[in-house]
Amino acid sequence: AGIEVIMYTSDLYPKKLLQLFNPPSVLYIKGDSQLLKAPQKIACIGSREATSYSVEAFKQIIPPLVENQCVIVSGLAKGADTLAHRAAIHYGGKTIAVLGHGFQTIYPKSNEILAQHLAQYHLLLSEYPPHIGPKKHHFPMRNRIIRGLSDALVVTEAALRSGTLITTELAL
């Protein structure tokens, strides 16, 4: 699938993102752009060091969300994000992965195959041009987009100083 560029003036651009401090002026997407128009998008996030608790929590939480046509939004990070994307797929739902880098580099590398699947059947989204690699400061910026796309936020586990809690604070 090719890369689409969505300007903030486009009908496809999620209007809730415009309410963010410093909204992205452009989004790069690969996959099913209509997922941006889904009426209910739910962020499912948690620790990169997710335990069996997150696995069990998503087994309980994601099926009813999928049954109600909710799109699962997460960040393709290792741990809870990966579990959320995989659970959405497993239960027949749709998912959006918001990246903290461009499409030419997938981080973590262990999620390259998952990212290819998402680009084909779901949606990858980034505010970064394709050639931009992952940088530490990109991930808090990514988190604001996860929050801005979502109508609700599900957190399974989080360390006291973590990107998950940054996203949660943005949601309050």
Regions inferred by a protein language model and the residue ranges of each:
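Glycine-biased, small-residue-rich flexible motifs in mid-sequence functional cores and linkers
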Residues: 7-172
